[in-house]
Amino acid sequence: MATAKKPTGTLALLGGGEWQDPYRELDGALLAMSGGDEVLVLPAAAAFEHPGRVVERATEWFAGLGGKVVGLDVVNRRDAERDDLAKRARDARFIYIADGSPLHLRSVLKGSALYAAIVKAYHGGAVLAASGAGATLLCDPMVDPRGGAYTVGLGLVGGVAVFPYHGKAAAHLRERSVELLPADATLVGLDEHTALLRLESGEWHVEGSGTATIYRKDAPTREVEGGEPLDLAVPAAT
């Protein structure tokens, strides 16, 4: 059964392709839900791929939506233990975890002061968005991008694994993730420009231009289009 521990904020897990036109309506809605105009962007997953450019792209994107971006200068574990940066996250109303390497992102965030602050902000009502690598990491189990098997994620959402870029992924990786899916877990394959949204009410929805493909060992595969609700409170496998 899908669980989100003590959730009181809004959670958006994106299948990739952040800050592009298909997400305009969703990102505008998330900004409004936050109750402010500031977005705290964490580029740590792109530490080896010009994280400064990630923040620049986000700044340009949210400016067009009436928002302003503050980049959180975190690229390694030492940064993630800084009290001043953790406080910025704890006080934020909208936190956006950018795409990149989920394994590097895990090494930065797992057990860190920064991750504790992010969770506290979310539990306090903040909007938390995570794209690609971030979406994968916030779940547990977590799809390992090196071969499609599973490893340990951060577990903000338990019992659910997210497979980003599902429609573009190599078939053998998708098939391996389905084959190795734990009996008590749900795999959500998210297409690019597609998001799994959990509202403060606890309801899950699929948003965006693509499809969410839902896999379980004990149920037929199903597809949910953007704009449709999604019941993730499925019974555990017997």
PLM features: residue spans?
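C-terminal and late-domain segments of enzyme folds
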Residues: 1-36, 45, 49-56, 60-64, ...
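A general structural motif
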Residues: 8, 36-39, 92, 125
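General beta-strand structural signal in soluble alpha/beta enzymes
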Residues: 13, 70-72, 96-97, 128-131, ...
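Short, flexible loop segments at the rims of nucleotide/cofactor-binding pockets, characterized by
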Residues: 16-20, 71-76, 104-108, 164-166
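A conditional alpha-helix N-cap/helix-loop micro-motif detector
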Residues: 20-23, 78, 85, 111
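Portal/gating segments that form or line small-molecule/metal binding sites
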Residues: 40, 46-100, 104
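Class I SAM-dependent methyltransferase SAM-binding "motif I" and its flanking Rossmann-like core
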Residues: 98, 104-172
